[in-house]
Amino acid sequence: MSIRRLACSLLLSSLALPVLAAECPAMLQGELPKLRAKGENIELCQYAGKPLVVVNTASFCGFTPQFKGLEALYQRYKDQELEVLGVPSDDFRQESADSKETATVCYVNYGVTFAMTEPQPVSGANAIPLFKGLAEQSRQPRWNFFKYVVDRQGKVVASFSSLTKPDDPELIAARREGDRLATLIPSRFTALHPSGRWALSVCLPRLARRRTQFTRRALQEQ
């Protein structure tokens, strides 16, 4: 997978105009309890108008080391308004029943600084509204560390399986597809080309031709 492809997706993600706080998309309306924050909640509408990566996480999964890549992604692009939201879940039987242990894994073991919620159901009929909304626009998680790239207008630009790492170029390209910033998402994340210059005349046709192909490959990964 080329870095150019990932960069193109991220660039297009950046093109969406910022959304006013008053224009909170339906999917982002509501709040979720913040992990080990003594009653503090995360207002999802704060993400309106920003590129967002939503990930369902688990503390005892083979993909748990992806926390490191997600944090690196967040640190690299947070100055460009990228947000990452981690939602722990025991839907796949790999999360602790003790949120203190969940917090230790992400905050202490992996140094996570992006927002994390208390464990939530993310699939099936019991999924929280946020994940129902994500699934309606894409598909529901089939395993832990399923990644959704959401643009500034609350639209899912792309989704990536657990196999896609946070530094994957295609994930970063998807982030650009929803925001004008040019470098953001994981799928098998790799660093964006240093020049950061990608013409729309190149990116738009490229994505138009390859999006269907990529979707098919992503489904096959599952």
UniProtKB/Swiss-Prot annotation:
Signal peptide (residue range): 1-22
Cellular component aspect of the GO annotation: periplasmic space
Location of the protein in the cell: Periplasm
Alphabetized InterPro entries for the sequence: Glutathione_peroxidase, GPX_AS, Thioredoxin-like_sf, Thioredoxin_domain
Keyword hit for Signal: yes
One Pfam assignment: GSHPx
Active site: C61
Catalysed transformations (reactions): 2 glutathione + H2O2 = glutathione disulfide + 2 H2O
Enzyme class at the top of the EC tree: oxidoreductase
Keywords assigned: Oxidoreductase, Periplasm, Peroxidase, Signal
PANTHER family, A to Z: GLUTATHIONE PEROXIDASE (PTHR11592:SF44)
Name of protein: Glutathione peroxidase
Species of provenance: Pseudomonas wisconsinensis
